């Protein structure tokens, strides 16, 4: 026997309802189901306070929820069998740590769905938020099995730390799709944001639309046709140890990335040339700040520099200093010609100067937010100088 749940009223305080699971309902009568405990804030209350619950003659181990549960979290968390159908929008952490069964949503869902799931299927006939199939914060191992199907769009950090399983997105995806991916497969039929596959070491990502930017840690391998589209396979992320990640992108929709520009064909605007900025810690930087002091001349010498490809360095007139600008902020840095840098990209050691340029993007933590950022690069004028760490803190309020 199945059950139908209908919210009695709007939820004023978010509800944590991990007891809404077909395998937990099995064998219980209506009174026992109504008595199952949920959390309203930090207070335990019976499920029956919030939902009208009735039996239905439909298939066994079926729960149908009719109504808006966008402020209800953990529905289907850890479920092992059965089916949940939700006719309405759903809140955070739907189906997290799910091991089996099926969840279908006729509406939109919030973030963290299928987090660290092991098996089963989640189907969303609408849009989804961030962190689909990802790992908990502080963990590196995300989705380990199962399948997530999203017919609409999805947000940032899809499949973060994914180990196995499948994620299908019928629409667009946000930034850092497949970040730190270790296995499994992600398919995006629409467009994706910047830096797909950041720090991936294994797994497959297929993006059939346009991507905002491609990290320099991906190497082009081959071209082939799939479903009538010309696709290109890249291997990466080469910034990781022994990477075996496969990133497929649509050739015709990504000519802005795939067509190698020449220095003669690039245009210097008033802002400068548009490049992709990447950052990371260096060994020397670590040695300098080991004692916690970032206010030394050595620190400025190491971190207030911009590594530029020979082509771009020549295009800018072989400058001594450059100005890098992003989202309204700009810094002056010492220009360093580096043959290890790809044309159209720059590298700045992670420090206060890099922090000024990094967008205030908080959906990701750690190094990936310092990767694949579009910035402008120009030759510094005679009156523009490199600011000290103290001056940057005072001007921009960035932390040390």
Swiss-Prot record:
Description of activity control: Inactivated by cyanide.
One of the GO biological process terms: methanogenesis, from carbon dioxide
Associated pathway: One-carbon metabolism; methanogenesis from CO(2); 5,10-methenyl-5,6,7,8-tetrahydromethanopterin from CO(2): step 1/3
Keywords: Methanogenesis, Oxidoreductase, Repeat
Molecular function per GO: formylmethanofuran dehydrogenase activity; molybdenum ion binding; molybdopterin cofactor binding
EC number: 1.2.7.12
Enzyme class: oxidoreductase
Residue span of region 7 X 13 AA repeats of [GW]-X-X-M-X-X-G-X-I-X-[IV]-X-G: 76-209
SUPFAM superfamilies on file: ADC-like, Alpha subunit of glutamate synthase, C-terminal domain
Sequence repeat residue intervals: 76-88, 95-107, 114-126, 140-152, 159-171, 178-190, 197-209
Catalytic activity: N-formylmethanofuran + 2 oxidized [2Fe-2S]-[ferredoxin] + H2O = methanofuran + 2 reduced [2Fe-2S]-[ferredoxin] + CO2 + H(+)
Stated induction or repression of this protein's expression: By growth on molybdenum, under anaerobic conditions.
Family membership noted in the UniProt record: In the N-terminal section; belongs to the FwdC/FmdC family.
Assembly with partners or alone: Consists of five subunits; FmdA, FmdB, FmdC, FmdD, and FmdE.
Physiological role: Catalyzes the reversible oxidation of CO(2) and methanofuran (MFR) to N-formylmethanofuran (CHO-MFR). Can only oxidize formylmethanofuran. This enzyme is oxygen-labile.
Record's protein name: Molybdenum-containing formylmethanofuran dehydrogenase 1 subunit C
Taxonomic source organism: Methanothermobacter marburgensis (strain ATCC BAA-927 / DSM 2133 / JCM 14651 / NBRC 100331 / OCM 82 / Marburg) (Methanobacterium thermoautotrophicum)
Lineage: Archaea, Methanobacteriati, Methanobacteriota, Methanomada group, Methanobacteria
């Amino acid at each position: 026997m199945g059950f139908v749940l209908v919210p009695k009223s709007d939820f004023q305080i978010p509800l944590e309802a991990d007891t809404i699971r077909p395998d937990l309902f099995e064998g219980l009568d209506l009174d026992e189901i109504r008595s199952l405990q949920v959390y309203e804030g930090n207070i335990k209350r019976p499920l029956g306070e919030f939902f009208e619950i009735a039996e239905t003659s439909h298939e066994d181990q079926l729960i149908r929820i009719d109504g808006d549960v966008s402020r209800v979290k953990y529905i289907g968390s850890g479920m092992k069998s059965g089916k949940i159908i939700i006719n309405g929008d759903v809140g955070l952490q739907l189906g997290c740590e799910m091991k089996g069964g099926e969840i279908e949503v006729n509406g939109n869902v919030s973030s963290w769905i299928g987090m660290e799931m092991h098996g089963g299927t989640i189907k969303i006939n609408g849009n989804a938020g961030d962190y689909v199939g990802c790992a908990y914060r502080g963990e590196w191992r995300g989705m380990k099995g199962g399948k997530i199907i999203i017919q609409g769009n999805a947000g940032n950090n899809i499949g973060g730390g994914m180990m196995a399983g499948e994620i299908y997105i019928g629409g667009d995806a946000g930034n850092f799709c497949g970040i730190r991916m270790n296995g499994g497969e992600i398919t995006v039929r629409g467009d994706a944001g910047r830096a797909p596959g950041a720090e991936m070491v294994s797994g497959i990502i297929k993006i059939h639309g346009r991507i905002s930017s491609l990290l320099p840690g991906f190497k082009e391998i081959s071209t082939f046709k799939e479903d009538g589209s010309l696709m290109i396979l890249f291997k990466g992320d080469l910034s990781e140890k022994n990477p075996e990640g496969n990133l497929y992108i649509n050739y015709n929709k990504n000519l802005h990335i795939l067509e190698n520009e020449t220095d003669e064909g690039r245009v210097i605007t008033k802002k400068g040339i548009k490049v992709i900025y990447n950052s990371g810690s260096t060994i020397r930087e670590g040695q300098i700040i080991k004692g916690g002091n970032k206010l030394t001349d050595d620190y400025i010498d190491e971190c207030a520099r911009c590594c530029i490809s020979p082509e771009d360095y020549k295009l800018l007139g072989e400058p001594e200093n450059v100005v890098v600008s992003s989202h309204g902020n700009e810094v002056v840095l010492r220009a360093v010609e580096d043959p290890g840098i790809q044309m159209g990209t720059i590298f700045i050691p992670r420090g206060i100067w890099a922090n000024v340029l990094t967008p205030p993007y908080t959906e990701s933590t750690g190094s990936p937010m310092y990767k694949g950022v579009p910035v402008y690069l120009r030759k510094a004028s005679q009156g523009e100088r490199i600011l000290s760490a103290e001056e940057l803190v005072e001007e921009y309020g960035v932390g040390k």
